[in-house]
Amino acid sequence: MERRAAGPGWAAYERLTAEEMDEQRRQNVAYQYLCRLEEAKRWMEACLKEELPSPVELEESLRNGVLLAKLGHCFAPSVVPLKKIYDVEQLRYQATGLHFRHTDNINFWLSAIAHIGLPSTFFPETTDIYDKKNMPRVVYCIHALSLFLFRLGLAPQIHDLYGKVKFTAEELSNMASELAKYGLQLPAFSKIGGILANELSVDEAAVHAAVLAINEAVERGVVEDTLAALQNPSALLENLREPLAAVYQEMLAQAKMEKAANARNHDDRESQDIYDHYLTQAEIQGNINHVNVHGALEVVDDALERQSPEALLKALQDPALALRGVRRDFADWYLEQLNSDREQKAQELGLVELLEKEEVQAGVAAANTKGDQEQAMLHAVQRINKAIRRRVAADTVKELMCPEAQLPPVYPVASSMYQLELAVLQQQQGELGQEELFVAVEMLSAVVLINRALEARDASGFWSSLVNPATGLAEVEGENAQRYFDALLKLRQERGMGEDFLSWNDLQATVSQVNAQTQEETDRVLAVSLINEALDKGSPEKTLSALLLPAAGLDDVSLPVAPRYHLLLVAAKRQKAQVTGDPGAVLWLEEIRQGVVRANQDTNTAQRMALGVAAINQAIKEGKAAQTERVLRNPAVALRGVVPDCANGYQRALESAMAKKQRPADTAFWVQHDMKDGTAYYFHLQTFQGIWEQPPGCPLNTSHLTREEIQSAVTKVTAAYDRQQLWKANVGFVIQLQARLRGFLVRQKFAEHSHFLRTWLPAVIKIQAHWRGYRQRKIYLEWLQYFKANLDAIIKIQAWARMWAARRQYLRRLHYFQKNVNSIVKIQAFFRARKAQDDYRILVHAPHPPLSVVRRFAHLLNQSQQDFLAEAELLKLQEEVVRKIRSNQQLEQDLNIMDIKIGLLVKNRITLQEVVSHCKKLTKRNKEQLSDMMVLDKQKGLKSLSKEKRQKLEAYQHLFYLLQTQPIYLAKLIFQMPQNKTTKFMEAVIFSLYNYASSRREAYLLLQLFKTALQEEIKSKVEQPQDVVTGNPTVVRLVVRFYRNGRGQSALQEILGKVIQDVLEDKVLSVHTDPVHLYKNWINQTEAQTGQRSHLPYDVTPEQALSHPEVQRRLDIALRNLLAMTDKFLLAITSSVDQIPYGMRYVAKVLKATLAEKFPDATDSEVYKVVGNLLYYRFLNPAVVAPDAFDIVAMAAGGALAAPQRHALGAVAQLLQHAAAGKAFSGQSQHLRVLNDYLEETHLKFRKFIHRACQVPEPEERFAVDEYSDMVAVAKPMVYITVGELVNTHRLLLEHQDCIAPDHQDPLHELLEDLGELPTIPDLIGESIAADGHTDLSKLEVSLTLTNKFEGLEADADDSNTRSLLLSTKQLLADIIQFHPGDTLKEILSLSASREQEAAHKQLMSRRQACTAQTPEPLRRHRSLTAHSLLPLAEKQRRVLRNLRRLEALGLVSARNGYQGLVDELAKDIRNQHRHRHRRKAELVKLQATLQGLSTKTTFYEEQGDYYSQYIRACLDHLAPDSKSSGKGKKQPSLHYTAAQLLEKGVLVEIEDLPASHFRNVIFDITPGDEAGKFEVNAKFLGVDMERFQLHYQDLLQLQYEGVAVMKLFNKAKVNVNLLIFLLNKKFLRK
């Protein structure tokens, strides 16, 4: 069945009954509402440009507010930014349904429609949408919004679809039921236009008349009349354009006709008014705006058609379009973008259409984005060029990484390479553009990736980067990948690159080089094969051709030597074949090269020999003996026995030999020389060239002497010369004769000289005088030589003389210094102090102080050597604490086991009594009941004594311990719940979980939860600091509520009680500041006093009231009273900081720190306003306004504050509130502007108050809680919680576990897996209690003793060893640097110590040892440090070097920076010496206290264990039969049962491998042991002992606790555990 196009007429109802008419009416209402939904859906689709659900589903899709918020963004983007819309993709909504944060979307939409000015008459409530309380009102608001936006030209017009759409009968019925279910009435959708018109603050009658005139003019169809009617000022129409008058007429006429037609389709004709057929003022304005927009779009299209940026800009700035963000300088961008959009639309539609307004707006936004990006890119490129010119690599990389530059990824590690390459490119090309930078950076980044792959030895990454097109490398071959990799690695190693990178040129050069090498190797192999083939062919010419191939790489291959090459290579190949035994053996390249070299050497030798022989022949022909002798000694000819003295003989002999060979007709030029290897070398005497083959057709010269012939002639001549030397035997006689002749000649010459002297005596005297002068000069020179020989002695004498002079001068200066010693001391002290200050400043502030500065202050460490011992003691105490904790954990586990055993014994005793009382009623047929009665704690709930329930209980205890001590889980859970359930959950579960902070531990943990939750809420929900003030944050609300009750209430009473009481007791106090109120009060008093009516008007404005001096006087008095009272309140508040609850102050501190961290750009004033809002407005202000509600003052029963009292408190609260928020009076409170100075002054006081309030210690210090607190505490924490709260908490954790613990390795998941599925309330309380008929089982309370499943501290031995190693190294280094000079650590450790240094070091160590001897015994536990200090300096140096290698292996120090990290550690120790000592002392005290507490806990556990042991023994002894009844010292008798008897009792189930017929032959003897609870079971078969079994009563109870029904004896007999316990109880134990 489908709904007809039009509703039924009134005639249809004449034939229907009352019920049918009522049903028809409901169907009609449902159809009308569905039509409105369809209209709203289509209008929203037009606005949002996306498809929406069907009308029947639209209501549900609106509840999360996403569509509404998107709609708000369409017309008010500044109010509803897209990024603020929660769950914009609706993924969260589709997964888990509605969330409380979806209400934010609804509020955004309401803010948007309020922002544009839609009358509040149409506004729905948030709950109308979120809870679906009144969806028709929401649709009504959407319709009103559509008409309002249409009037403003911001949205299309909504269309009336009544009677035009069809719905199924099921849809109509469902909608009618839905409307009837909520009892909702449809709003009058048709009256929206009239309501909007009535909302105008103008003369409604004039507007109505003008609108009617317009409608009538439109009906007449006269354009001029219509335009005149539209221009009537009473019509309040805007943006009228005369050129469009005809279009207005046509559009309005069409709209009026459609509206009239739609009105005729409606059934409720009696309720229709004139505006159902006439256009309203809003509709007329909307159509005008629509026409204006269309006309403006045509202008835009015309500008695009003309390609005119100026015309387009003017068209875009048309107010009718109301485009956002149009900028004059982007006209070209607009033209380009809108042209592109226009062409794309034409292609899609197949024809040219005008762009819609939204499309133009989108194009403007896109063009703005592109323009901004382009401008930002150009600015970024300018900055990059400037940075490149500055040559600061870090700045260049920073600018390159700027996103606005639109460049590929940049890697800062290669900053120097970017700087260098880009600087070179900039020098070559000038200012770099974006495209050039893009290509360059892309290439350089690819080069960086290649370098990083090389550094990491990553071959695959290297190859992928190398073949990347961005790298731009040419001729990269895949088969050479490994060669490229190896070659580049080798290049990096050769250059010794550390942090430097290979450049692109290096990469390309290496690639080309590798390619060339590869090609060269290929060609070389081919050339070698061709050479071998030529040798096989036996052709010297082919061999020469192959040798001359460039690829072979053979040098000095020449044509004349070709036969020799071929001969030698063939011989070498033949020899290789013989040696290897391979006939096909070939010569390798090196062997070929050796053959070529040998052939060239042979040719050179033969050539030089031939030249030498030719030279000899030529010299012989010239007849010059000396020339002949010289050429004979030519080494190239290698002639033997050539003697220089035989030159003439050689000449004669060789001339004779040549004459004998001379032939008259011999004119040939070729001669033959025989070589040593039997080959012949042919030499041309004219060209001096030789060859290895005889030239064809050329005769040889026979008259030319050969080398052999020349050698023969030389040998003969030399032999003859040797014979001639025999005459040397008579040489002595010749010498004697010559001596006598020489003596005669000398004597003759002497006589002649004497005669000459006598003749020339004056000349002789003169000569003697010259001789004496010479002698005197010689003596002088001798003295001079003597001085030179004794130079050291002379220098020493001179030094003594100079020393005397210098000493005299020194003594004079020393005397001067002694006279001015005070001034000198001051100067030196000032210099040393200044130097020490500079060094200390470097030590304190420098990140890496030099070693020389550290050495200057290293002596400070000597004064605190006990610090190192204390550190060792600290480590020892930590280890002892860990061991103690583990020991206590083991004791605790043992106590738990003993506790279970005691419980089993007690429960067994109770069960035994029940069994005995019913034992007589049992028969053979109901033995199973006996077994059931022996089951302990059957169905008694969570705390029943069974293993399964025990594990469930422990799992809950572990879970709630984790929730209590790890606040992040509850903090996240709070924000996963709907907002209306959060407060209930907090009060019902969380405050119970923390026992309402009744102890130090719970107060500390609850405060940690508040801190974590507040940080989580600010992180996820707060977009700006002011949101905390304007909103109502969940955590802030809960914190204030918690701390304002109980102790917080008493604090409020202490702070505000006295001043509030003063206000209440002052009956004449007047603080009214309203001028009108004061004015009326004055008139009333005047009339009451005079009895005459005042002539003044009663109703006046504030300004008129203030014109009367009496009113001003009263206002001044009220203001003085208000300021005086406010000062009292301010003083009470600001002087009571310490009385504000600590938790409240700490939360304020966390709020301040968290806001400052999330909003670093926020000013201190903004943050202080938020914190002040928390401390004053939320915590203190309610107590000021309503003290009776917070029991600040005592009120009589039924009493209340009087109105004047409440007004006075409200006035004070308002003033304090303005002061706390820093808000001044303005606007309607102009008369209070005199208080603004006071508010500003008071605000500064509030800021100081807030600052002091936030200065609180951390909770760990406040509550004396640390990581050992739970381990030291003897009593375990307990919580009391109802079963319903337990189940609800478990359910919530299961539902939201993935949100609050995303990591599946989180401990929460493990604990939830331990708990398993969600239990029911009867499962937790037990079926027996559930059957008792409690009205509300969920309110039954259970107690949980919280325990930590993950408790335990792992002592990190490696960490302790590392710290000890570092500590020892630092101490050794501190000792070394005080005695060794040097600027670096390596230099100091490599120097040898002198005797003086060793002595000074030994003296210091002796003093330290004496100091250590006085150290108390508890600090002497680690003696290794003391032992190290006694080592000599050389050994300490070796120890430090070894330790440095170990520390470097651990990654703590690095040799690259000279172990600066260790020097920094020493500097840090010196800086933190005093602070560290106090902190370590406090840590030692804390650990000692912890150790003492653990010892106390250990003693408690041991005592409790002893007590439990005694109690168990007592229980067992009590169960044993009384010794009096059995006789003292008498042993209890044994029981004897056959297997058949035990089978009949149900105790025995079966015996494996033994039929039941033989059971009568098996006897079981049960004998009590010496200790209570122990039994010995002896099995006999046919009277023969077979097996013995020790049975422990507690083991049986443990099996029963674990739910084991059957156990084995002797590994064969199966017995019923419950019935066996019953049998032992009955026969051996007391009843």
UniProtKB/Swiss-Prot annotation:
| InterPro entries xrefs | CH_dom (IPR001715), CH_dom_sf (IPR036872), IQ_motif_EF-hand-BS (IPR000048), RasGAP_C (IPR000593), RasGAP_CS (IPR023152), RasGAP_dom (IPR001936), Rho_GTPase_activation_prot (IPR008936)
Q: Name one GO molecular function term.
A: small GTPase binding
Q: Which UniProt keywords apply?
A: Calmodulin-binding, Phosphoprotein, Repeat
Entry keyword annotation includes Repeat: yes
A GO cellular component entry from the record = cell-cell junction
- Name the coiled-coil region(s): none
Residues with the modification Phosphotyrosine, per the entry, are: Y162
Domain IQ span(s) in chain numbering: 730-759, 760-789, 790-819, 820-849
Q: Which residues form the Ras-GAP domain?
A: 1004-1253
Q: Which GO terms describe its biological process?
A: ERK1 and ERK2 cascade; G1/S transition of mitotic cell cycle; gene expression; mammary gland epithelial cell proliferation; mitotic actomyosin contractile ring assembly actin filament organization; negative regulation of gene expression; positive regulation of gene expression; positive regulation of mammary gland epithelial cell proliferation
All copies of the Calponin-homology (CH) domain together span 34-149
Q: Does the keyword Transport apply?
A: no
Modified-residue entries (Phosphoserine), positions: S539, S1424
User: Which protein, by its recorded name, is this?
Assistant: Ras GTPase-activating-like protein IQGAP3
